[in-house]
A protein has these predicted regions:
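C-terminal structural segment of proteins
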Residues: 1-268
């Protein structure tokens, strides 16, 4: 139906990304296609070594999932920092990742986790890596008529450390800056590390160079500072009511420092 209606149609799930954009006239679709009645788009399941989450699964359902609590606790931690309970009851994971809003929390987490988005359209199905999905503010790799149907994440190893640290002005606000970290430790040193940054560029950021600096280290102060500098170097935040460019850049570094410390504490 979306493909038949063309570029003037938009899918509607929870509506917490699309409806505010429509109110601001940033989106002016002629048709809304409600996805609420498609049960195949909802649910959380294990598929071999992957966790698969349907696109219309709400943040409230992510918080309540025993599977995610065991396998991907960073998703629960992040969901609890999104907006407020009213929004979390309706807002969906698919809407959060597919909208392309640089202020949304889940895209950077998905980059951190190396997630893949399952996408469907009139031409069939395909998969797109989260790290290749975001092309600019509100611009993604989705073609007209395509929707994200599920998010696929490889289950991290037991004993991994994780954290999502978010600075915001008030409850329900977008991040001034935020950082997602997942790592594993071996004999007191970082064996693997992945980092995503939220709302400090036109897209979520994957801090690959910072990761490389940290692998093999004991997360000593000098190495962490070097990695933080590498992460700050890829940011390009807008100066807005959340603060000037320099402040938001430095807050990204502060959030990353905190996330690394917390992830290290949690790693076993």
């Amino acid at each position: 139906m979306l493909a038949d209606l063309g570029e003037d149609a938009r899918p509607l799930a929870g509506g917490h990304s699309l409806i505010p954009m429509m109110k601001l006239r940033l989106a002016t679709p002629s048709h809304l296609v409600d996805l609420a009645g498609v049960p195949e788009l909802k649910g959380i399941r294990q598929d071999g070594g992957d966790i698969v989450i349907g696109a219309t699964t709400t943040q409230h359902e992510l918080i309540g999932s025993a599977l995610l609590a065991d396998e991907l606790p960073i998703l629960r931690e992040t969901s609890l920092l999104i907006a407020d309970p009213q929004v979390r009851y309706l807002g969906t994971l698919g809407g959060n990742v597919a909208n392309g809003d640089p202020g949304n929390d889940m895209p950077a987490v998905m980059m951190c986790l190396g997630a893949t988005y399952q996408v469907a359209g009139k031409a069939g199905e395909r998969r797109i890596a989260a790290r290749e999905f975001y092309q600019g503010a509100y611009f993604t790799a989705l073609e007209p008529g395509e929707i994200v149907t599920a998010i696929r994440i490889k289950a991290p190893p037991a004993g991994h450390g994780w954290a999502y640290e978010k600075l915001k002005r008030k409850v329900g606000d977008y991040a001034t800056a935020a950082a997602a970290v997942m790592l594993t430790m071996d004999s007191g040193k970082v064996a693997t590390c992945s980092i995503g940054l939220t709302n400090v560029s036109e897209t979520p950021l994957w801090a690959e160079e910072a990761e490389k600096i940290l692998v093999g280290s004991a997360l000593d102060g000098a190495t962490v500072r070097k990695a933080v500098a590498a992460a700050e170097a890829i940011t390009s935040p807008a100066a807005d009511s959340r603060g000037p460019v320099h402040y938001r850049t430095k807050m990204a570094g502060v959030m990353l420092t905190r996330a690394l410390a917390r992830a290290k504490e949690r790693a076993r």
